[in-house]
Amino acid sequence: MILRLKDQTLIKINSTRSYLSSLVFRRDSHSQARTKPDHDRRRRGYERDVRIEEKKEHDGLFLCKSKGQHLLTNTRILDSIVRSSDIRPTDTVLEIGPGTGNLTMKLLEAAQNVVAVELDKRMVEILRKRVSDHGFADKLTIIQKDVLKTDFPHFDLVVANIPYNISSPLVAKLVYGSNTFRSATLLLQKEFSRRLLANPGDSDFNRLAVNVKLVADVKFVMDVSKREFVPPPKVDSSVIRITPKEIIPDVNVQEWLAFTRTCFGKKNKTLGSMFRQKKKVMELQSLSAGRHGSNVEVMNQTGGDSDSDVEEDGKDDLLCLDTDASMFKERVIEILRTNGFEEKRPSKLSHRELLHLLSLFNQAGIFFHDITSLQMDLHE
């Protein structure tokens, strides 16, 4: 009987210890949970719009993911972006999409002036008040317009957290625009950054990369986790630095862009296969004839950067063309064959090779740009 009572007492003691331990463990777990960044807790249960509170600046601001409104909140990363930008005390910095001013405040401390382009009126009001409260109002110029439709004033550098949904056209505007600048340090979607960094032979080498790198060098700076943003996007980001080249190739930009659109429309096909297709032959014949005053109807151009279509070698298309078109096609293929390009693929070619091929075509009277079009298409 005494032994049984001792056993029962031990069981109760062990049970009590286990219960107390569980309480301590749960308390520690809750304590650890409270040390996690605020955005880790806020991210749960939100779909599109997220309400955030920044204690000193504003209360109850709704951010829309569909408009690319993701605020970078990590001070360490903000400092790293500013350091990697090599800002001089005399510089004017262009910031695109400043939001509530987390990066703007850092830029104002380092540069002489900051020009911030922001479309959202709410953000403009918050930014203006925040900057004024910190005594930087005379160093900041705010342009409340759509950045893609705005003529930029003079600037020396670009430092910006770019909205994901305008990355391609904005990079195009910067590198092929009329403004001269030293560099652009951009926070972009990680996948988009990888595409910009891609080189010939890489699986993701694409038309955007080949066009940007014609006139600028692109350098990787660092990766940034999606957890560092409020609200957190679905994907991670990267910081890259774009530096315009001092010397660029002597090539007609519109002709080059049209040429790369043709080549990278089916970038993994051989050039011989691509230029044997009846539709492509007729299109090039029309565009080339238009340079000589011909009234030949210009066919609609096809674009894209996809290899999803079924590959056609086009060997029998020659029988379907009239005499002039057949002669034109033979001229195109002869240029490719004679210069060793017939079996090569655009995704493997360097800038030097692409420029050489375009020069050979133009010298033979074969052109790619529709002279009636004024649109500059840099990206897919």
From Swiss-Prot:
InterPro entries: KsgA/Erm, rRNA_Ade_Mease_Trfase_CS, rRNA_Ade_methylase_Trfase_N, rRNA_adenine_dimethylase, SAM-dependent_MTases_sf. It comes from the Eukaryota. SMART domains: rADc (SM00650). Coiled coil: none annotated. It catalyses: adenosine(1914)/adenosine(1915) in 18S rRNA + 4 S-adenosyl-L-methionine = N(6)-dimethyladenosine(1914)/N(6)-dimethyladenosine(1915) in 18S rRNA + 4 S-adenosyl-L-homocysteine + 4 H(+). This is Ribosomal RNA small subunit methyltransferase, mitochondrial. GO terms for cellular component: mitochondrion. Pfam families: RrnaAD. Signal peptide: none annotated. Its main location: mitochondrion. CDD domains: AdoMet_MTases (cd02440). Residues 1-26 form a transit peptide. It is found in: Mitochondrion. The gene is DIM1B.
